[in-house]
Regions:
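Catalytic-core region of right-hand nucleic acid polymerases
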Residues: 49, 61, 65-191
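Amphipathic alpha-helical protein-protein interaction segments
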Residues: 50-54
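Non-catalytic, polymerase-adjacent accessory regions of viral genome-replication enzymes
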Residues: 1-49
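Generic non-transmembrane alpha-helix signal with a bias for helix starts/N-cap capping motifs
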Residues: 12, 57-58
Length: 191
């Protein structure tokens, strides 16, 4: 986020500036996971799709680390971090494109245990088509005809940093890589 965000005359400017300075916090509603739960999640590991695309996972994570989006550490180096939670990594093949990595934060209850801190009015997941059609139908005709333009922004990201103490909550167990210890990927920002 650009440092000049604080000077923008908008009600969200102070909030966005705080996120710029401190990162996004991730609060959980449950006690830290005991070591045996973390170990079980590590052993459960990632989705089989990630292991099937092991070379892609390795290259993609190396690229993400180079760009400062993720950090990859040996599990042993972070195993005792009190906020560490592990989610499985998946890899979705896409027709005529390279695969896409996904993190399943629902599998080990990370989503369920995460406190929703964002403003509720910003959380408009689902029913996108219905919302768009409603807006089109109820547009003010005084402004002329309504046009719709669909733009694919899947490769455009606004990366906002995570609060340093929150990043381990969203960690991912990487698939076993030959000759390497168990590895964990920790996001440094949210896409």
């Amino acid at each position: 986020i650009n440092p000049s965000i604080a000077s923008i005359p908008h009600v969200a400017a102070p909030y966005l500036d705080r996120l710029r300075r401190h990162g996004i916090p991730v609060a959980t509603s449950t006690a830290p996971w005991p070591p045996m739960v973390r170990q079980a999640c590590l052993l459960r590991n990632s989705h089989p799709s990630a292991a099937e695309h092991l070379d892609f996972v390795r290259d993609e994570m190396a690229d993400f680390c180079e760009k400062g989006f993720w950090a990859v550490l040996p599990y042993a180096a972070i195993a005792h971090h009190p906020r560490l939670r592990l989610s499985p990594l998946g890899c979705i093949p896409q027709r005529d494109r390279r695969p896409r990595l996904i993190t399943n934060l629902t599998f080990n209850a990370v989503n369920a245990e995460t406190v929703r801190l964002g403003p509720s009015e910003a959380m408009q997941f689902g029913r996108a088509l219905q919302r768009i059609l409603f807006r089109l139908r109820h547009a003010n005709p005084a402004f002329g005809p309504t046009y719709l333009c669909k733009i694919d922004i899947s490769d455009g990201f606004y990366r906002i940093g995570l609060a340093a103490d929150s990043a381990p909550v969203l960690a991912v167990a990487l698939p076993p890589m030959p000759g390497e210890p168990a590895l964990v990927a920790i996001p440094l920002s949210l896409p």
